[in-house]
Amino acid sequence: MKQLFFLNFLFVTQSAYSQNSVAFKEEFTQPGIENFINGATGTKAVFKSNSGVQSSIEKETSILSFKLDTNDAAGAGRGPEIISKNFTHFGSYSARLKIPDARELQPNVGAVVGYFTYHADKDLGLSEIDFEWLLADPNIIYVGTWTGQKGKLERIGRTINLKTGEILSTAFRSNHDGVNHPFSGRQNKPKKLSKIEDYDASARFYTYGFDWHSDRITWWLLHPKSGRKIVLWDYKGSSMGIPLHASKYRMNFWHANNWAVETNPRSLEKPKYNFELEVDWMSYKPSKED
């Protein structure tokens, strides 16, 4: 009886979330944003987040501009952030963006760009799927998920140097300070990646995306020249780490003082400049599972 009650509760909860899952593409061509709200909790500086701004490298492209405020404290959500007005669920997510190049001005800056879903439900726990970049090394991409209850979170993740094609790690861990347990078999596909010789997330726009299913998550990007989809991680073969309840679709940019990129352990400095993230568009298309 308890199991039946829980399954019924889960179905009702999922239905309530899923009814808001409608496809959209936010182009950021106007000052007003249709599908997202401001989610920042830091300073209220007007320059931090602006839509309809001209790109610094593509004059014909209007963008969402996120700029770090040097007065913001460390922590996710302190810097600029947008959060979808409605819940999103299983389906295909993609975005075209360019992260800042901080290497000349402040090579040891501690700053994170996050492209992700996130919702912490008091009963079902955390539902997060993410892409992350640390400004100190724009050749490296972090992808993964967070699931579970507060204090008992679980992470599955892969770290990639796309310029060299090296997979630095593919692993599971408990909580933020847990030990990495490497994956093998179907959870570790593809085992090898082809390098993109001139990959630099701060040099140009790239299109990134992930496909979220109940039994599988695939992270990918489009090759900047051929447009071919390059699969970064096709995680399947286990239900561990796959969020099952709906979430909120997000983009953020923030100072991290306790997470340094693998290639530069000193990259924890508070930002000294108003580094700018440029987002061309964000899209979401629900799947038939939803």
For the regions a protein language model found, what residue spans apply to each?
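Sec-dependent N-terminal signal peptides
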Residues: 4-12
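Sec/Tat signal peptide C-region and signal peptidase I cleavage site
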Residues: 14-18
